Curated annotation (Swiss-Prot):
Protein name: Small ribosomal subunit protein uS9
Region (Disordered): 95-136
Entry's family note: Belongs to the universal ribosomal protein uS9 family.
Organism: Prochlorococcus marinus subsp. pastoris (strain CCMP1986 / NIES-2087 / MED4)
GO cellular component assignments: cytosolic small ribosomal subunit
């Protein structure tokens, strides 16, 4: 999924994790990250694990200083949003070149993490936590 913006190729990808959804654009540039109009460092609270997660697909292909990442993300918390951005960036890189798919897939950047919060059941305090058992 690519389009042209001012004679530059733009590659789109969508990522999801828990309840977060990220729409990612990759544009040839110098490696800056913008998330919801803010810098990536600022948006992710300078958390190195979240920043590394966002940059992981580009690092896998050695393109960390070749593309700018522009993201619109909503829903969930920072961890879910960071992983959604990672998946969206990986999908956008697959649009860049079909050869990128294999290394990204072996690193696990293209797979959707199916884990999500388990619902609370009636009669219990939380999803699995029951009240204290009394024998007598």
């Amino acid at each position: 999924m690519n389009s042209q913006v001012k004679n530059k190729a733009v590659y789109w990808g969508t990522g999801r994790r828990k309840t977060s959804v990220a729409r990612v654009r990759l544009i040839p540039g110098n490696g800056q990250i913008k998330i919801n109009g803010r810098s990536g460092d600022d948006y992710l609270n300078f958390n190195p694990s979240h920043l590394n997660s966002v940059k992981a697909p580009l690092l896998t292909l050695g393109l960390e200083n070749s593309y700018d990442i522009f993201v619109n993300v909503f829903g969930g918390g920072l961890t879910g949003q960071a992983d959604a951005i990672k998946q969206g960036a990986a999908r956008a890189l697959c649009g860049l070149s079909p050869d990128n798919r294999k290394p990204l897939k072996t690193e696990g950047h293209l797979s959707r993490d199916p884990r999500s919060k388990e619902r609370k059941k009636y009669g219990l305090k939380k999803a699995r936590k029951a009240g204290q058992f009394s024998k007598r």
